[in-house]
Amino acid sequence: MTAGNVTPKNNQNIIPDIRKWPFAKEIRNFSTPVFPVRHSGNFAVLKGYPDPELLLESAYDTVKRYLRAAGYSESETADYRIETRYAPTEFFESWELDFSAQGCVISAGDTEGIRRGLYEFTDLLSAGNGAFPAAGQKISRRPFLKTRLGRCPFSPVKRKPVNVDELLEETDYYPDALLDTLAHSGVNGIWIVTALRELGQTSLLADDPQRERRIAKLRKTAIKCRKYGIRLYLFMIEPFSVTESDPLFKEHRDMFSADPDINKVKYGWCPASPLTRKYLFELLRSIFTEVPELGGVVNITLGERTTTCLPAVPNRPLTISCRSRCGWSAGEIIRNSLQAMRDGIKAGSPEAELIAWFYLPQAYDPADWVKGISAFMPEGVIPQFNFESGGQKEQLGKTRVGGDYWISYDGPAPRFRAEAEVRRGQPMGAKLQLGCGYELSIVPGIPVPSIVFRKYRELFRLGITHVMQSWYLGNFPNMMTRAMGLASFRDGDSSTEDEDTFLLQLALPDWREDAPAVVRAWKLFDKAYQNFPFSLVFQYYAPQHNMSEWRFHFLPDLEPLAEPWIPTSIPGGDAVGEALGSFTLEEATESFERLIRLWRKGMEELLPLEAKYAGNRERERDFGIAKLLLYQFQGTLNLLHFFELRRRLYVENDKFHLTEMTAIVHDQQRIFRAMIPLLEADSRLGFHGEALTRLFDEHSVRKAIAEADRALETAEEIRNSPLAPVEQVFQRGVWKKIVPEWRTVAPGFKWKHEISNGELSIRLSCPANSEYILMLWFMDAPGCGCQQIDYVQCENGILKYLWNSLLHTQGCIGDTGIRLGCEKPDEETTERIFSWPLKKLPAVDPRLPYLRFNLCLQLGKDFYFAFGKGMGFRLLQGKFSPHEGGCLEIPC
């Protein structure tokens, strides 16, 4: 079933064709800087550091490649020598460079310190335009972040609708050039998606038929990564919940929770059961025994899916679905589950790590039982929390609350800081999203490295020791990746290193004498990006991801917005209110006006350098990223302006606004034409790492230009019609008035609406003993304001208010003014009444007295809608399609 503009999620599986992506080939080429001046002279690399496993050969090769690119020749009798030596150090990966007229001595106490020192030498060589660094310098650094996790930018996500298992693929997702670039950027860990049962062995289950094949690929990949100082980590969500058909559930019921999860489908595991702990221990022990080169496991322990008997949704009261009656607290349940996992990992590989990720992305605060959960970690287990989730930011005179990941918010969020204080002096991890993120997902990196500096300064001050730098998206090696690597190392205990010095050090290897101008541009981009609307709904659904795929609806069709990370979603839509969250359309527009004004100032610093770097592919792509971002911002602003003008067109019922609306469409076409050469030159642009597809490319943008022409034809039809705009909308069937009469919504269930005394009431006639969940949806008629959804449950004949959509937009369950009532409670058929003061519903302009409405009745696993058939579930939006809503006429 397809509703509105989005294809619902189903069992369709998409296999990405890597051959279509030029960047997948380019990423296999080693990067070498362009030196405008060729130097003469000889060099020698003296491998004095003991390296019996030849782990440093890749880093030595990088040094030689850079020196040859600068014009030098390798000679055993060279006057300039780069020598590595062993010297004891207090910290793993720390290093020292000592320069003289005869060369450079790189000393460290371990191979990884030597590796970092060799990479530092190449950066200094690049910063000096190929000249050897000045004699007399002595530079030392040590990392404060022990683990720095990255990822291949296009490796599989292993879930529908892109369900590909990279351990069963022949594709090498980790070519040598990519590993070298990641290592050079400071990455020392890569994570891949796995499932525990598919890899491990346990006496409780038969082996997966493909297990040996997966283990062989895993071992091969781990050994290859190790040659670059990179350890391979297994990402998982374990113990993974099961259905009643699972063989273990059938044979060992006591291993699982008493009741299924909130969706009434899957069961969590009981850590109090010795068999559960045995299951986890044996599976992990077998994996790490067979592949001891692995770095460890990153496990979402709480928050994403049901794992144990604890609620997966962390804002709910603590209700433990228990059969064993163990009496354990939430912290003890988590501790025992993690302890079994840790013991299994350590039994196979004592140096491997277990990172327990508490994925709590919500804008709202978690329940009390979740707070301070890091205090329950078993020894040796590293808790990890989202750095920005639940943060607050002042924008346009209001306090905004943001969930999930944010680049534009420095952080940390209060809940992260609180957990860091609980863990003070003990290892703790941070989940960041710093290449690109859900704010803007379609470039390799957003050029705002000063934000990296400030985030990592806070990590240092809080004593954070591990960082996961990205999710499925934001993994292309780029300047932001290098910024993260640079910020991970310090020259001592100081947490007040100068931001300008950091930015200059980052810019010099690529931009040399032009670094000061580039730093000025970066700082202006940072100031600009601070204006990005701090709203989780906006970052997920607004046009900045793929504005060229949004169509200009001159009629308020209210097609639903798409989830950019789901490749089966049809992009576009025009129900812009779904994307606004806590922002009004006017506020979002003003935010982008401010953003663009400052971004343009940054471009004024950057673009004068463009001609100088013609032919330097990497710098040309840097210019292209900055330009494309400006076009995305401008195109988003055009759409926001367009929707505001469309609102006026129908509120004022005046065709005068069509002139400015058509001018916006023409300007959008101009932007599209400017985007095409950038998209042709860099196939990374438009690519979404979670959807594993380009959200737009040069071909789709050309189609968008043609689609805009067709939209202009609709504008002319509206202009030339003898009917006023509102009359046309009703005549075309875009809007349909709701008559106040009884309507059947499901067998045995009827509803109707009443409006009187400043209140709207929805009456539901239903069997007295029925159990259901009722969702009631409202949006202003033009679709330019945030939607409102109220959720009510009837259980055992008692109505219970669950929550409303303000939870996601405001960070708390706001007051929608709803009142619950009942008539004829003692009869077989009863009437439930749901009432709101009209002033509490989305605002209605007296000149356009209509409110879009729909309701959804959930009976068990079935969903029934008052209008239409709904659609596949969308994150934060539910199953409603705004396109299907009817129009309530509101007396004003």
Give the positions of each predicted feature:
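Short acidic low-complexity segments
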Residues: 69-85
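A solvent-exposed, charged loop/short amphipathic helix patch at secondary-structure junctions
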Residues: 313-328, 655
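Feature activates predominantly on carbohydrate-active enzymes
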Residues: 10-55, 59-69, 88-302, 307-315, ...
